[in-house]
């Protein structure tokens, strides 16, 4: 009989959280998924769980963190009794603390998948640190995106033996066949328009680059930015102030297929990730891996897990966070040296294909779930 996994996640709707949907598609198990933002009238237990998650959120805002762990945990316990899974997989640490007590009450093994802000945002991390310590007493397995994330959780008592580092990975079926040497002088950025993604710094660097290029390259250089978010208006103002409206395009949201097509039309991929003012940082950006798997060279920062995937001078060019001048120079190298772009892109594709595809990620997650389920079974078969 195949392993039965109950997957709990805070949201099905977030457009940027395609990795949760990817796990639903790719993990080779029987899967039951329940999302905290859904309240389906035809499924009373899932409806009650959605209401309980809302109550848990409200109690968290009020600072009643211990009490906040009870409402959703109670409905999760009922879900466990109803579905009788072999193991529970919870996406995001902040969601796991809402439901974690159900694992202790039921004996169902608990695996938690940390993604990024749940292990880095200063306000969130500090507020939940005691709850995380309790969480680590109840977990059988932990999945993290990078070594810095692993170290952050270990500082709160997470067991390194139960932890696996596994970036979410890129899909080879979508991301392939870029030819940066033959592409126009076009740079591409993909990600939510939030502080940790550094879209403002990316545009500032591009503005510096354009100002020093000679014609005709100066007029031909382009920067395409895919994504939406709270910085969108500020970003558009910056583009207008720099008189770059003809060369910087804010494309909004695009489907994975459209992003893959854009990557096949670009010279390089750029992302100036930084630690945000609230302490939020990346895990290991999926778009960086998708770009490399496509065959694009990457210009990015030495931030979070990025240096674990992008090797400076081999598969891309890395600069320090907030060093806009170095970012401009690295972008310029890709536009001025198409042969360099091709060499870096080819090496990046090999690196991701050999260790950072979504299939590698599914294999790692499957291993954690199987080991956790094998350690103990809560149900009498």
What does each of the following model-derived ranges do?
Residues 1-47:
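N-terminal subdomain of nucleotide-sugar transferases
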Residues 6, 143, 179-208, 224:
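Conserved donor-binding/catalytic core segment of Leloir-type glycosyltransferases
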Residues 90-96, 114:
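Short His-centered aromatic/hydrophobic patch
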Residues 148, 169:
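Carbohydrate-associated surface elements
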Residues 234-257:
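Nucleotide-activated donor-binding/catalytic signature segment of Leloir-type glycosyltransferases, i.e.
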Residues 264-279, 296:
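Acidic donor-binding loop of glycosyltransferase active sites
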Residues 288, 312-313, 317-324, 333-339, ...:
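Conserved acidic donor-binding segment of nucleotide-sugar-dependent glycosyltransferases
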Residues 288, 293, 297-300, 310:
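Short hydrophobic beta-strand element within catalytic cores of glycosyltransferases
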């Amino acid at each position: 009989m195949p392993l039965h996994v109950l997957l709990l996640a805070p949201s099905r709707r977030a457009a940027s959280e395609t990795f949760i949907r990817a796990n639903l598609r790719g993990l080779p198990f029987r899967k039951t998924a329940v999302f905290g933002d859904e309240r389906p009238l035809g499924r009373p237990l899932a409806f009650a769980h959605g209401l309980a998650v809302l109550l848990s959120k409200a109690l968290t805002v009020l600072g009643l963190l211990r009490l906040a762990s009870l409402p959703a945990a109670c409905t999760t316990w009922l879900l466990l009794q109803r579905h009788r899974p072999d193991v529970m997989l919870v996406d995001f640490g902040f969601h796991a603390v809402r439901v974690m007590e159900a694992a202790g009450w039921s004996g169902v093994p608990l695996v938690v998948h940390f993604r990024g802000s749940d292990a880095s945002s200063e306000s969130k991390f500090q507020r939940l640190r005691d709850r995380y310590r309790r969480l680590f007493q109840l977990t059988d397995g932990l999945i993290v995106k990078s070594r810095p994330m692993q170290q952050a959780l270990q500082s709160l008592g997470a067991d390194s033996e139960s932890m696996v580092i596994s970036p979410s990975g890129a899909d080879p079926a979508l991301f392939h066949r870029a030819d940066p040497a033959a592409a126009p002088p076009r740079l591409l950025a993909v990600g939510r328009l939030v502080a940790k993604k550094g879209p403002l710094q990316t545009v500032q660097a591009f503005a510096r680059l354009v100002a020093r290029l000679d014609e005709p390259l100066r007029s031909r250089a382009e920067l395409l930015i895919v994504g939406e978010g709270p910085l969108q208006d500020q970003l558009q103002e910056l583009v207008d102030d720099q008189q770059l409206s003809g060369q910087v395009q804010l494309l909004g949201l695009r489907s994975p297929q459209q992003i893959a097509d854009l990557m096949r039309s670009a010279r390089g991929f750029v992302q100036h990730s930084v630690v945000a003012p609230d302490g939020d940082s990346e895990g290991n950006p999926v778009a960086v891996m998708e770009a490399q798997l496509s065959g694009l060279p990457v210009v990015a920062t030495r931030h979070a897990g990025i240096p674990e995937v992008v090797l400076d001078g081999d598969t891309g060019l890395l600069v320090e966070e907030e060093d806009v001048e170095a970012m401009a120079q690295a972008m310029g190298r890709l536009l001025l040296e198409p042969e360099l772009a091709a060499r870096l892109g080819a090496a990046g594709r090999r690196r991701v294909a050999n260790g950072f595809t979504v299939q590698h990620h599914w294999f790692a997650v499957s291993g954690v779930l199987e080991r956790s389920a094998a350690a103990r079974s809560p149900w009498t078969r």
